Regions:
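Contiguous, well-folded functional domains in the mature portion of proteins
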Residues: 1-263
């Protein structure tokens, strides 16, 4: 009974957040945006629409576009770029089918990929990086490599928070939460990018599959959310850039690794 009540309240909160974020009444949406800007001390220099008056509703503001000149895309063909603005949570090798959620806490690759055995085999002993998007970050998600978007599979799940406290206390957090699994194919390297939803995430949107995207092209948006996990297969060597470290802030478009085929 307790779980039913908890789920009902969670769903009610979710629906309420969605409705509030889409309110177009100027007095309300302007108050919401101004309050958010003040609380998170957000500088709008990187965004074409700099005033709270320029946005239709709060979600329009939250998923605001960025000035492309402020996020140059690394043009090295063999580079992996950060798909988002955020903070690096973990990165490294996928070993024994496990990834670090946070220090001393693992989760299973098989579960993260929703039980897809073929993908699990291809990415076992590969590499990964997880990046957390705070509420004040830019919330559009971009292609980390050039390639064809072959899959976009939405996995239903819960809506736990994904901040530091949640990562430390909720086992298998990324597996439990709703997430969008996308797969890119390219001659140099395949790549999986997983967009993990969080509490108060209204939705995750994504672009069309079976299309070719350049590195840095917009692929999706968090309409109030969360974390991105990038996976590289076991036939690709990832040489992480010197600035890549846990708790390091990264910007969309900057190089985070050099990729090469393992012969």
């Amino acid at each position: 009974m307790f779980n039913l009540i908890q789920n009902f309240l969670s769903d009610l909160l979710q629906r309420t957040v969605i409705k509030v974020s889409l309110i177009e009444i100027k007095a309300i949406k302007n108050l919401l945006i101004r309050t958010f800007l003040k609380n998170y001390q957000i500088e709008m220099d990187d965004y074409p629409r700099k005033s709270h008056l320029d946005y239709k509703h709060f979600n329009d503001f939250f998923t605001r576009e960025i000035d492309p000149s402020k996020r140059p895309i690394d043009d090295n063909h063999n580079s992996l770029i950060s798909p988002v603005d955020g903070k690096i949570v973990e990165f490294g090798k996928i070993e024994e089918g496990r990834l670090f959620q946070i220090k001393d806490m693992h989760y299973k690759l098989h579960g993260l990929l929703d039980g897809n055995q073929t993908l699990t085999q291809n990415y076992e002993n590969g590499s990964y990086i997880s990046i957390y998007l705070a509420p004040y970050n830019y919330h559009r998600v971009h292609a980390p490599i050039k390639g064809d978007l072959k899959m976009a599979n939405m996995v239903p799940g819960e809506m736990h928070r994904v901040d530091q406290n949640a990562l430390s206390n909720i086992e298998n957090l990324y597996i439990k939460n709703q997430r969008l699994i996308t797969e890119f194919n390219d001659s140099l390297s395949d790549c999986i990018m997983i967009m993990v939803a969080a509490r108060n995430v209204a939705s995750i949107t994504h672009k069309e599959i079976n299309q070719n995207y350049e590195k840095g092209d917009e692929i999706g948006r968090f309409n109030l959310g969360s974390t991105v996990v990038v996976l590289l297969p076991n036939d690709v060597q990832a040489e992480w850039d010197h600035h890549v470290s846990i708790e390091k802030d990264v910007k969309m478009g900057e190089k985070i690794a050099q990729l090469s085929k393992i012969k």
